[in-house]
């Protein structure tokens, strides 16, 4: 059997391997077996989902698999991914499951898991679960089948946790906030939380129909929110993705700020207050060199990891760091959450606005980014373009052209069949030529796929 787990659980197109109802049933049974190894009858799991049409299918299939092995299932309905991590801990569950493909289109879906501590499962745990899927799992006796129950107040519990992360002496009165929920899991939670804190809320992307998640809106399409900010004269825009674990911020002029600018702001503010653990920020290899230079000038360190918020979190836990994230908008603040939380990060930015009395355009302009270019090349199943001699030669030549004054990063996506080619260099022309040469070689290697 091919490897199921990628960098963020199991993901693919709905009704195609591995994202079929049959496979979800097998995954549920294997996970149930894994967490019932000690034979206890008290094990429970919480399941959340985003707003994709296929979410109902996978919710039922997973529930069937889990209960067939004696697990008791608590169904949260549509909630953000970070809410699942939170409620797994607060409801004393052994496992949390989120059904979502995050920022991907509605035709995709995915399944990701959280352990009893609210953090994503380790690679070792996923490997053991895959082995159980391959070998098959026996169902329990009829009297030992687990129960399934819907939990109606999950989103309200999450809203209360969000509000406790916001300074108690502060309100958002007078702030006009555009919140783009990507027609996803936060379409009710986010506007409600902002309204309860006193903001004037302009909600967009809050009309999910099962097929429009991330469609022309949310963190992958921030221009929609940017246009709304300008049209309404708003102070700031907050763009979430389909499961609300990432955020992109918009200033009052409509300019888009990425995760690097937000992390720079929070690292600076936390360091000034003695709150930044180990005076360091954890980010991935995709974060801009400008961020690294900015932190260095402040006497702070940048710890880089592989791409994926799970690797950021693993490094944070191993090194005792409390702030990390990705340029794409996954922001992890372990003082408040166990995983990337777009809405939590957005609230921390609003707190910075109210405390500093500075506009978003100032707060999101911490450093001048080094020019960066990212291009993707799609490949077909079974192809290994990075092993092609032509591609290796093009990469070596491009690295030589950058002459140690920039960066070249080539990697396969962990969630899609893409080769990502990224370069940074102060000379735009040199950077573009380096990327073009590698992209051309990869495209040739895959036959223009």
Curated annotation (Swiss-Prot):
Belongs to the phosphohexose mutase family. The gene is glmM. It catalyses: alpha-D-glucosamine 1-phosphate = D-glucosamine 6-phosphate. One of its GO terms (molecular function) is phosphoglucosamine mutase activity. The active site is at residue 102. The keyword Oxidoreductase does not apply. The modification Phosphoserine is found at residue 102. This is Phosphoglucosamine mutase. GO terms for cellular component: cytosol. Catalyzes the conversion of glucosamine-6-phosphate to glucosamine-1-phosphate. Its cofactor is Mg(2+). Mg(2+) binds at residues 102, 241, 243, 245. Signal peptide: none annotated. Binds 1 Mg(2+) ion per subunit. PANTHER family: PHOSPHOGLUCOMUTASE (ALPHA-D-GLUCOSE-1,6-BISPHOSPHATE-DEPENDENT), PHOSPHOHEXOSE MUTASE. It comes from Roseobacter denitrificans (strain ATCC 33942 / OCh 114). Keywords: Isomerase, Magnesium, Metal-binding, Phosphoprotein. One of its GO terms (biological process) is peptidoglycan biosynthetic process. Activated by phosphorylation. Its EC number is 5.4.2.10. Pfam families: PGM_PMM_I, PGM_PMM_II, PGM_PMM_III, PGM_PMM_IV.
């Amino acid at each position: 059997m091919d490897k199921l787990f990628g960098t963020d659980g199991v993901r693919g197109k709905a009704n195609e391997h591995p994202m079929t109802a049959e496979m979800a049933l097998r995954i549920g049974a294997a996970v149930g077996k894994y967490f019932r190894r000690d034979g206890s009858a008290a094990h429970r799991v919480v399941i959340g989902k985003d707003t994709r049409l296929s979410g109902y299918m996978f919710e039922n299939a997973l529930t069937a698999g889990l209960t067939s092995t004696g697990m008791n299932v608590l169904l949260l309905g549509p909630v953000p991914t970070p809410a699942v991590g939170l409620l797994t801990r607060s409801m004393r569950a052994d496992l949390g499951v989120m059904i979502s493909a995050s920022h991907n289109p509605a035709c995709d879906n995915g399944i990701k898991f959280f352990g009893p501590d609210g953090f994503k499962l380790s690679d070792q745990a996923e490997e053991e679960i895959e082995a159980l899927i391959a070998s098959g799992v026996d169902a329990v006796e009829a009297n030992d089948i687990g129960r399934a129950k819907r939990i109606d107040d999950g989103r309200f519990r999450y809203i209360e946790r969000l509000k406790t992360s916001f300074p108690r002496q502060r309100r958002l009165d007078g702030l006009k906030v555009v919140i783009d929920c990507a027609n996803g899991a936060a379409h009710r939670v986010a506007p409600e939380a902002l309204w309860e804190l006193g903001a004037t809320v302009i909600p967009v992307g809050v009309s999910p129909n099962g097929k429009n998640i991330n469609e022309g809106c949310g963190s992958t399409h921030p221009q929609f929110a940017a246009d709304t900010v300008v049209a309404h004269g708003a102070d700031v825009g907050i763009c979430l993705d389909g499961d609300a674990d990432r955020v992109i911020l918009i200033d009052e002029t409509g300019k888009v700020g990425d995760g690097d600018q937000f992390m720079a702001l929070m690292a600076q503010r936390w360091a000034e207050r003695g709150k930044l653990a180990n005076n360091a920020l954890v980010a991935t290899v995709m974060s801009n060199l400008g961020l690294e230079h900015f932190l260095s000038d402040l006497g702070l360190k940048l710890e880089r990891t592989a791409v994926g918020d799970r690797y950021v979190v693993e490094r944070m836990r191993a090194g005792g760091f409390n702030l990390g994230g990705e340029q794409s908008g996954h922001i992890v603040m372990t003082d408040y959450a166990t995983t990337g939380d777009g809405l939590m990060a957005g609230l921390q930015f609003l707190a910075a606005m109210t405390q500093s009395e500075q506009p978003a355009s100032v707060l999101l302009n911490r450093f001048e980014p080094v020019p960066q270019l990212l291009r993707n090349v799609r490949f077909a199943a079974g192809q290994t373009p990075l092993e092609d001699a032509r591609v290796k030669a093009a990469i070596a030549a491009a690295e030589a052209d950058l002459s140690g004054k920039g960066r070249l990063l080539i990697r396969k996506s962990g969630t899609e069949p893409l080769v990502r080619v990224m370069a940074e260099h102060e000379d735009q022309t040199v950077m573009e030529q380096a990327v073009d040469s590698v992209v051309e070689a990869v495209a040739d290697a895959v036959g223009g796929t």
